[in-house]
């Protein structure tokens, strides 16, 4: 399902996510919901819980301890609303236990990305993508700059690009 829930700001997006997910849950009637990560779409936890559908949160327990970060707010809401929290690391599990979550409902699974990378490692190593993009191994870096504090402000984005250019020089 494509939710088409983008809003003019975080609050509007979250509201649209809740409404759209509730409609999907009504139509599909799933036995459980798996929520992955900490983006605004993880607020799917709210309509699922309202419909008494069990929620599993994968990537639970991650913390930056900065409540100014929207994803940190989302993490805490989802972690404390989900029925079962699936953590990628021991430290993430420990954070949730310190926050009072029951140990039997906080399960360390490890990172599925590690499994994917391990599975495809030989194909990655044989890939000609560096050649096709005219890149030298060790002479480039990849940046994920999707956080709103980095990209929603032209000033912040320009500073980020300037910093990356300085590192690359």
List PLM regions with ranges.
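Conserved nucleotide-sugar phosphate-binding/catalytic loop shared by glycosyltransferases and other
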Residues: 1-16, 20, 24
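Short beta->alpha connector loops at strand-helix junctions that form conserved
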Residues: 3-6, 36-37, 58-61
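A nucleotide-sugar donor-handling region in carbohydrate enzymes
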Residues: 4-5, 81-159, 163
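Glycine-rich phosphate-binding loop signature in dinucleotide/nucleotide-binding domains
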Residues: 24-31, 135-136
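An aromatic- and histidine-rich active-site surface loop
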Residues: 34-51
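Active-site proximal beta-strand in glycosyltransferases
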Residues: 48-61
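A conserved, positively charged/aromatic
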Residues: 63-83
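A conserved nucleotide-sugar
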Residues: 164-169
């Amino acid at each position: 399902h494509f939710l088409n829930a983008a809003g003019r700001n975080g609050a509007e997006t979250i509201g649209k996510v809740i409404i759209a997910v509730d409609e999907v849950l009504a139509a599909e009637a799933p036995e459980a919901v798996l929520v992955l990560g900490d983006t605004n779409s993880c607020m799917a936890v709210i309509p699922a819980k309202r419909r008494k559908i069990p929620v599993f949160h994968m990537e639970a327990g991650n913390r930056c301890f900065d409540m100014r970060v929207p994803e940190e707010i989302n993490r805490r809401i989802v972690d404390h609303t989900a029925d079962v929290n699936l953590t990628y690391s021991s430290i993430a599990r420990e954070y949730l236990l310190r926050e009072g979550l029951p140990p039997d409902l906080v399960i360390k699974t490890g990172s599925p990305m590690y499994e994917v990378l391990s599975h495809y490692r030989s194909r990655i190593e044989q890939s000609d993508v560096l050649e096709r993009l005219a890149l030298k191994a060790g002479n480039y870096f990849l940046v994920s700059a999707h956080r709103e504090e980095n990209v929603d402000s032209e000033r912040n984005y320009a500073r980020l690009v300037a910093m990356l250019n300085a590192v690359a020089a």
